[in-house]
Amino acid sequence: MLTVKFTTAYKKSYKLMKKRGKNLSLLEEVIDTLRQGKALEERFRDHELKGNFKGFRECHIQPDWRLIYLIENDILTLTLVDTGSHSDLLNL
């Protein structure tokens, strides 16, 4: 089982998603699955990121709600980097 680390950006974005009325139980389901070291269901469209985010992964909680995360197996840590819409995450 992985230890979960929350970045400051993630904590701030989590509050924003709560304020926007997002179904946070969907996010908790994804986090719990990742924490257990299991693969996400195909509906979450989990994929590796490129460019500046190389090494990080992203999944789609809902069509315009994403989670960026990093799994560090050497220290068994799941780092939740950020969550939000595509525009939120890319600062568009």
Question: Predicted segment positions?
Answer:
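Residues that recognize and position ribonucleotide moieties
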Residues: T3-V4, E42
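Enriched for short, Lys/Arg-rich terminal
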Residues: T3, A9, K15, K19-L24, ...
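A short, surface-exposed loop/turn module that caps and links secondary-structure elements
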Residues: T33-H60
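Short, functional N-terminal and low-complexity linear motifs
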Residues: M1, Y14-M17, L34-G37
